[in-house]
């Protein structure tokens, strides 16, 4: 298995417990556009020498370059009730009924790259917000051909 890390110094790949620098010519944009991102990454590492690893994990960046972040799905059932209650006054509570009973998941825009927090990074919550409902997320890296190549 390959693990790809984005760091301030560049991309780093972990393979079989060893860490390798990715040539700077190979970008995250190129990986997202490649038909086979893993093969492209492996080819770029043919002449790579291992580097000291593990120390980069405190300085990870979000693993995207110019990609927008989109989401698919619905919120957890417990949150559904809260969201329906909060939107009832505006008449939007029926919106969630439609989302939960749809044949396919809802697709919605989440963020542009500069608004994505790095792993372990802080998030901003509006000062006028009375409450916040954090939920776990699973993120998939999907190339331009629709193939999942990372998570």
Predicted region positions:
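Generic N-terminal segment detector
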Residues: 1-72
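Active-site microenvironments in enzyme catalytic cores
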Residues: 40-151
